[in-house]
Amino acid sequence: MKVGWNTIRFNFVDPSFIKDNSDCFGEYVSRECRIDIQKELIGDQLINTVLHEIIHAIVYNSSLNQDGGPLTDDKHEEQVVNSITNWLLNVFWENPWLIELLKKRSS
């Protein structure tokens, strides 16, 4: 998948809550241009997690989380990414015609 100039691949992984001491559903790994997603996710959790990590990739590739940027604090980045993801998905789900309009623009 292309995000800006980067090609990002998806990697569906087994979660390791004990090893990682984390309950995150996904993670953008910038150095490897990779998004890891827990492979047992389905439905809305999968959709939300994929878009959430894509937005993290956009934030990183836009330098918004670099020194001096508005999202240098990880907590702020997570709050912004989570809010944008949830609102954007709501817009798409409540307005399915919008997806069709966006697909027409790209063809």
Please place each PLM-identified region on the residue numbering.
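Metalloprotease/metallohydrolase-associated module, dominated by Zn2+-dependent proteases
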Residues: 1-45, 61-107
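Active-site recognition of the HExxH zinc-binding catalytic motif
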Residues: 48-60
